Amino acid sequence: MSGINGAGPSNFFWRWRADDEPVTERERDSSSGANLTNSPQLRPESPTVSGRRLLRSNALSRQTREWQETTSASAERATPPVEPRQPPEAQPAERIVAERIVQELVRAGANLNNVRTMLRNVMDNNAVAFSRVEWNILLQHFPDMHTNGISSDSVLANELRQTLRQVVHQQRTQRALAPILSPAPSRPVASSSRSSQRTLLGRFTGWMAPRQTSSSSQATSSTSVDRHPQDLNQLESLRLADAERRNRSANQTDTDEALRRLTQAGVDMERLSTSLGRYIHSFQPAPPDLRRLLESVGIDPDIPEELTLVNNPVLNLNVALNRMLASRQATTESSSVFPSRAGDTRVRTLPVMPEREDNENNVAYGVRLLRLNPEAEVERVVEAFITDPSSRPEVVADIHAVLRSITSQFRQLRTISKADAESQDFRDAADYPDDPTSCLFGEDLSLSNPHQQVIGLAGESTDILQPYSQEGNKALRFMDMKKLAEHLASKPVHPMNRDRLDDKNIAGYAFRVVPD
C-alpha cells in the first residue's frame, strides 16, 4: 500500500506511513534526531503542543500563525470549562424555621450567645448547659437531641447557627456604637424604623433594645437635664439578667410545686432523698413506687447517660429536698432518741439517716451521710452510726483522708476573678441574697462563707499553666469543692460530662474563685 503524503504550513513536509509499509534507510537516518512529534511512528500529541514547538523557529509564516490560532481555538472549544462547585444552600423553609426558633428564644429572654455556643457543643458531642427554657424550645425542633444529639450535617442546625451568629454580631455592633442616652430622647424617624423592621436582624434589634420610658415631668419639661445617663449596654444587660432570673425562678417554682405535692401525698422525704442521692451519685435507679410518684408530679426520674446533671429536674428536686430536710434539723435533734430496728443500738441524731447498704463500709456510709446532712461534721456523722467510741477516731481519720485528697488541692488551683465568674452567671449569696448561685450539690455559694471552697468546674480540661478560656474549658459550673469531694468519694465521675474525675486530674478542670 502506498503511503500518504502531504504538505503542512510553510511547505513543511509531513508524511504518514501505512502500517505495513517498510521504513526506508533515509527515513531512519533523518528521523534519528527528529522530535518524537514528527516521528512517522506516532501521531502529533495535540495541535497546541505542536504549535508551541513550531514557535521555537525564528521565522513563522502567516499561514503557520493562522493554523496555530485555528487549532488552539478549536481545542479550547472542544474542552468545556469546569464550573466551580457551589456549596449547598439551605432551603427557604429551613431559613424560616431557623428565624422562628431565634424569635422564640428572644421572646423567652434566652442568652443567644450561650445558645449559639451550646448548639456548637452539642453538634460536636461536647458538654452542654442549656437552661430549661432554651432546652424546651430546641427540643421542639430537634426531638432526638436528648438521645442522639444534633448531627453536624443537619441543614436546620447549621442555618440556626448562622442566624444566631448574625444576630449576636448585630447586637454586639449595636452595643459598641450605641450612644449614651440623651436626657430628652428624640422621636425616631418613621421611615428608618420601618426599614429596620423589614429585615430579620432589624426585628431582633428592636426586640433586644431596652424600652425607653420617661416620667411625666420629663415629658412636660424640655429643659430638664438627666445628670446620670445610663449606657444602652448596661440597660440591655440588666434586661437579659432579669429574663434569666425569671427563667430560674420559673424552674424553682416548678420544683417547689412538685415538692409540695409530694409532701401532701405523704411521701417519706428521707427515703426519697436517699433514693435521689443514690441515683445521682451511684446511678442506682429509684424504687418503682417513688418513680411513679415523681412522674405523677411531672418529673422524669431518669437521667440519660448523654445528658449532663446540670439544670436537670431530678438534681433540682434533690437540692430543694436537702434544703427542706436541713431546715428540720433543730426539730429532729430535739426529738426523742430511738433505735431504728430491733437489735440496733444506733442513735438517730442526724436529720437524714437512711439504712446502710449491704456493700457499704464505714467510710462509704459516712460519706453518704455527709452528703445527706450538709450541716453535720464528720465526727458527728461517725458518732451517729459507730456505737463503739474507741473505733470512731479511725473511721473519722479515714473519711478525712478520702475528702482531703480533693480539698487539699484548693489553694493550688488556677484562679478566676469574681468579676469573670459573674460573667459566667455566678452570684455571690452575700451580694444577691434573693437570687444566689446554688452549689451543684446543695447550699448557696458565697466567697465570704469560711466553710466553703468556691470553685468553677469546667467542662473540658486544660493544662494547669494556662488561664481559664471559655473556648478551651467551655462553660463553668460553680460549686463547693468540699461537696464535690463527697460526690467523688462515692463516684469519681465528672457531673457535667460523665468522664472520670478524681484527685489526679481535678486540677485540670477546677478554678478557684477569688475576690476582685
Curated annotation (Swiss-Prot):
**Which regions are flagged for Basic and acidic residues bias?**
16-30
Asked if ATP-binding is a keyword of the record, the answer is no
Quick check: keyword Secreted in the entry? yes
Q: Where is this region: Disordered?
A: 1-93, 175-259
Q: Where is the composition biased (Pro residues)?
A: 81-90
What keywords would UniProt list here? Hypersensitive response elicitation, Secreted, Virulence
InterPro entries per record: E3_ubiquit_lig_AvrPtoB, HopAB_BAK-bd, HopAB_BAK-bd_sf, HopAB_E3_ubiquit_lig_sf
- Sequence ranges of Low complexity compositional bias: 183-196, 212-224
Induction and repression of expression: Transcriptionally induced by HrpL.
Chief place of localization: secreted
Where do Polar residues bias regions lie? 31-41
GO cellular component assignments: extracellular region
One GO biological process term is: symbiont-mediated perturbation of host programmed cell death
Localization (cell)? Secreted
Query: Please, which domain of life does this record's source organism belong to?
Result: Bacteria
Stated family:
Belongs to the HopAB family.
Q: What is the role of the protein in this entry?
A: Effector protein that plays different roles depending on the species and plant cultivars that interact with the pathogen. Acts as a virulence determinant by enhancing the development of disease symptoms and bacterial growth. Acts as an avirulence factor by eliciting hypersensitive response (HR) and plant resistance.
Put simply, this protein is called Effector protein hopAB1
